[in-house]
Regions:
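Glycine-rich phosphate/diphosphate-binding loop of Rossmann-like nucleotide-binding domains
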Residues: 3-23
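Alpha-helical segments flanking ligand/cofactor-binding loops in enzyme cores
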Residues: 46, 50, 72, 92-95, ...
């Protein structure tokens, strides 16, 4: 199951992503926001990131204007490996090599078509494991240094 959320800057793109998920019969929970009214991205990123980190959701998708704020906020939560992706190769590598568990998109940076292509790549690409598993474990060790 996918946890999905956006701030006001990502609302229009999130509606398109919801259509895509519905067409594919992919289960998700929409954490909001539910309008284009201004809201604070950390308030959206935190519950989604905590739910993904707790294992309640397999993956998450966060959307804001640039993706930067959501990415920073999500990566504050231990266990989260949020990747801001503006191309499909980055999404593929984020999954294959970094076991990214949250995809972050910048709605004002990329168009809908590219966003859906990135989403497809992120969702279908498995984690490669092997030497990359060791590196992901090292990221977890860094979280414990706080």
């Amino acid at each position: 199951m996918i946890a999905l959320g956006c701030d006001h800057g990502g609302f229009v793109l999130m509606r398109e992503i919801i259509k895509c998920l519905d067409e594919r019969n992919l289960p998700y929970k929409n954490f909001g926001t539910f309008s284009e009214d201004s809201c604070d991205y950390p308030a959206i990123a935190e519950p989604i990131s905590r739910a993904v980190a707790a294992g309640e959701f397999e993956k998450g998708i966060l959307i804001c204007g640039t993706g930067i704020g959501m990415s920073i906020a999500a990566n504050k939560i231990p266990g989260i490996r949020a990747a801001l992706c503006s191309d499909s190769f980055s999404a593929e590598m984020a999954r294959q090599h970094n076991d990214a568990n949250i995809l972050v998109l910048g709605a004002r940076v990329i168009g809908t078509g590219l966003a859906l292509y990135i989403l497809d790549t992120f969702l279908k690409t498995p984690f490669e494991g092997g030497r990359h598993a060791r590196r992901v474990a090292m990221l977890g060790d860094l979280e414990n240094c706080r």
